[in-house]
Amino acid sequence: MTISPPEREPKVRVVVDNDPVPTSFEKWAKPGHFDRTLARGPQTTTWIWNLHALAHDFDTHTSDLEDISRKIFSAHFGHLAVVFIWLSGMYFHGAKFSNYEAWLADPTGIKPSAQVVWPIVGQGILNGDVGGGFHGIQITSGLFQLWRASGITNEFQLYCTAIGGLVMAGLMLFAGWFHYHKRAPKLEWFQNVESMLNHHLAGLLGLGSLSWAGHQIHVSLPINKLLDAGVAAKDIPLPHEFILNPSLMAELYPKVDWGFFSGVIPFFTFNWAAYSDFLTFNGGLNPVTGGLWLSDTAHHHLAIAVLFIIAGHMYRTNWGIGHSLKEILEAHKGPFTGAGHKGLYEVLTTSWHAQLAINLAMMGSLSIIVAQHMYAMPPYPYLATDYPTQLSLFTHHMWIGGFLVVGGAAHGAIFMVRDYDPAMNQNNVLDRVLRHRDAIISHLNWVCIFLGFHSFGLYVHNDTMRAFGRPQDMFSDTGIQLQPVFAQWVQNLHTLAPGGTAPNAAATASVAFGGDVVAVGGKVAMMPIVLGTADFMVHHIHAFTIHVTVLILLKGVLFARSSRLIPDKANLGFRFPCDGPGRGGTCQVSGWDHVFLGLFWMYNCISVVIFHFSWKMQSDVWGTVAPDGTVSHITGGNFAQSAITINGWLRDFLWAQASQVIGSYGSALSAYGLLFLGAHFIWAFSLMFLFSGRGYWQELIESIVWAHNKLKVAPAIQPRALSIIQGRAVGVAHYLLGGIATTWAFFLARIISVG
């Protein structure tokens, strides 16, 4: 028998083009240089809208995939530069305008502030007393808690980090220019997924986690141990001293050998018990700070680093060993999936929209998961008792997640219109999903109807029974009980199971599932969250709104290329208002319109989630703890009986808790009162664009132009009404901005007052 040697795969190498695109300020100075029509300059006011719509739509600049890839790659560096500048500004505020050092000395008594308003015409009122004689705006970003966890002990260190951020921003701007104009990677480099996976897994995630674990062990842990013991920040050695002077570490962790080589030997000889002083497995929260044990999180990051460094050696590049992604995908055939994943490798290496759609859906879901974990297992010291920050972080990560998920659907639909090739996808999973899209969408539609009528029906029933004075006939914990038995079972399971599955852990991962109240400075950090009928009912509203959002977004993707109504939809593009005047009922069917409608339902969905969270935590978790251990919650546990009627939500949540923002004038919170009003205005302004006929505006504009002509002051650029799609875009943007800013003002004025 002869064994044929494996086919030699071409070697992977980094290939670039030298000086592919000249650097020309003259070209950049010309608006619309990337588009032949736009470059001619404006004839009508539509030009400025098209300029914004197409500036970053690289697909429309060129059809060359290599050039598009380079533009995206370069734009990523530009994006990172903006992020570094933004972060630098945050750190600079911490260094220059904050009470960080005072907060560090008394984190339970002093509120974080990093912004001081200049009293130009009386705005000084916004500088509230945050304790310790400092007057400023209370911040809710959680940065103080993050800085303490990192081991930052004074404002000079923040100053240095801010400068470091600007240096990094400059480096990123240079890299963005360099990799487009000087050394631009070839298309094959962008399509080399094995090398990318190896580098991202081992380098970015593996070494990234390892360096963070190293920082936590050598800097964060000793500094936080001293802070927790009550040592003043100014008496704590500087971070580099802990690294360079092993005797400092030996004082704090005497069991450990802090020698340069001898300290690493136990890791490779599996004698891991040597590290048990600072790589712990405590579980639960640190009772001093109310945050996760920093020694647990250091342990976690070290473990994650090991896993990802191993993962970064799994894919085959130049050494003939490891996985090939194309082989994995083509071998992946289920019993009911036909050709399975065949063709997906080509899809994901030639369509960046397809790639982006998956990444956005994943990152959005991850952000929502982060929101849930940040309050249940607060990762930083004194975060749990800073209620305004907890509420802000939850709300922030929920909104971000919602937007990213909708973005995933948007780019999924763009992929379908611009990049999908039916000939390449024969009987694979993508093709099969598209072939039975009617079954998928009609089932989803049925689920939405079921959830909508039943969840809303429970509320309507309860409102009616309460109005009739028949509490015994209501769905409630004291009437007809609808206990969330599965959720309670999961809570119980997670409280008991770790005793068997993680016998070395001192406590379960999260107190939210069960356990004792964790109190810091007389405030509840976390305690078991009791679930009842009210939660069961709201949960089904969540299920309803999520399913409707998914229905709209998925329908947009699955019907982006064609539908029974418009079989040639792909030819009309991703966004079009209607299929011409000759056909009725073809408006709002483009991929873009589904994203537009999906955004409203995403907004509905996330709003209910953050309202539920805000009220539930104030009612059943957050509050004060008396010396005898009794807990007094902010709203005294009113959620269970009030959140079961629509009237309860309107009266006991929205109206009752809006009193702080409505009555904020004349106090340091007055900016929130103004924001509340102003954001309502922006929201209402959006309706003008959403309930509008384009022809009305065009007629109005023409009579105004006529008047200008009469007076011989007619403009050279002809004014035109917004197109239908532009009007919708302006409408949805203001709707979301107004709604989110209203919620922000409502939440913060409330929780800063009572939290």
Curated annotation (Swiss-Prot):
It is found in: Cellular thylakoid membrane. This is Photosystem I P700 chlorophyll a apoprotein A1. Its EC number is 1.97.1.12. SUPFAM superfamilies: Photosystem I subunits PsaA/PsaB. Chlorophyll a binds at residues 688, 696. The chain crosses the membrane at residues 72-95, 158-181, 197-221, 297-315, 352-375, 391-417, 439-461, 536-554, 594-615, 669-691, 729-749. Chlorophyll a' binds at residue 680. The keyword Protease does not apply. Keywords: 4Fe-4S, Chlorophyll, Chromophore, Electron transport, Iron, Iron-sulfur, Magnesium, Membrane, Metal-binding, Oxidoreductase, Photosynthesis, Photosystem I, Thylakoid, Transmembrane, Transmembrane helix, Transport. Phylloquinone binds at residue 697. The keyword Magnesium applies. PSI electron transfer chain: 5 chlorophyll a, 1 chlorophyll a', 2 phylloquinones and 3 4Fe-4S clusters. PSI core antenna: 90 chlorophyll a, 22 carotenoids, 3 phospholipids and 1 galactolipid. P700 is a chlorophyll a/chlorophyll a' dimer, A0 is one or more chlorophyll a, A1 is one or both phylloquinones and FX is a shared 4Fe-4S iron-sulfur center. It comes from Thermostichus vulcanus (Synechococcus vulcanus). InterPro entries: PSI_PsaA, PSI_PsaA/B, PSI_PsaA/B_CS, PSI_PsaA/B_sf. It catalyses: reduced [plastocyanin] + hnu + oxidized [2Fe-2S]-[ferredoxin] = oxidized [plastocyanin] + reduced [2Fe-2S]-[ferredoxin]. The gene is psaA. It is a multi-pass membrane protein.
